């Protein structure tokens, strides 16, 4: 943190970052670590780096990017290594060109640690406010205006709003404004872009319902354990940030180790009481069945994706369950992964079952698996 917030035109920052998700955190840290006086603005300081969808880092076409961020001095790799509850190297039986490290993280531990890193970073201020608009002078962005009419000025403004920019949430025919469930969307900022003549397009992403761990019959599922010899994301750490989180895994997950615990730690870290000495947590695999297909296909007309209600373009390699049954009609079943959201929660994420179907249909679909 710096010595104090800089308000008004007479006290500009070098850089202002709007948003505190994965991109915003890396942008703010990169700026501050290069010596620039930086301000990060977010609507809620308690949801910095919140893993809104799957609490995992890396995987196919993503694991290499995490390592590239690390090589450039970023924090994501270290944050994942120190808060992971399971490590897996995907495509381990194939060549290194297609291998991909992946870590299932503790959703809250990841969020809390990243916030702590930001709070300790020199040259970086954090402020809770919704950015309502950009301030232009002479055709150039020179600052931002918040929902409280507070103005901050800077030489550079970085916008990392993610799903919050005029976000809409669809559950069947039900539509609500929001960046994610429980959080407001950023409405005013879109108007600033339009005023500047910047064209806006709408993108789409989806997420599955979370389920209660105690409701799962694990005897019907295939267990997926973490790797015995974990492949980590971070190459090294020379940042020397004090009092950052620490993870230990028990010896049963370390190959040929003479040590009692496997340590993922960095200089001057303190230990967290809920992590030391605990094993990696298993994920579980299952499939959709004929009943699942029936429920989805019988209700396609209720899906916002197929009724024309959703106009945005979705991610190519993360199709919804509706898309899977339509685009891959020849497949009788689709693979699903049940993944824990953390050590201290009973919530589980169903990887492969993202949907925008109505609540009742989602319930029938879940009960069919």
Q: What positions do the PLM features span?
A:
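Flavin-binding catalytic cores
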Residues: 191-201, 288-310, 337-339, 353-369
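Short hydrophobic core segments
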Residues: 16-18, 151-162
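Conserved N-terminal/central alpha/beta ligand/cofactor-binding core
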Residues: 12, 29-137, 148, 160-180, ...
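Terminal amphipathic helices with adjacent charged low-complexity linkers/tails
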Residues: 208-221, 320-333, 345
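Core mixed alpha/beta domains of very large multi-subunit molecular machines
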Residues: 310-332, 339, 356, 367
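Intrinsic disorder/low-complexity segments
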Residues: 1-8, 240-269
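Beta1/beta-strand and adjacent pyrophosphate-binding region of the FAD-binding site
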Residues: 10-23
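Short beta-strand elements
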Residues: 156-162, 327-329, 334-342
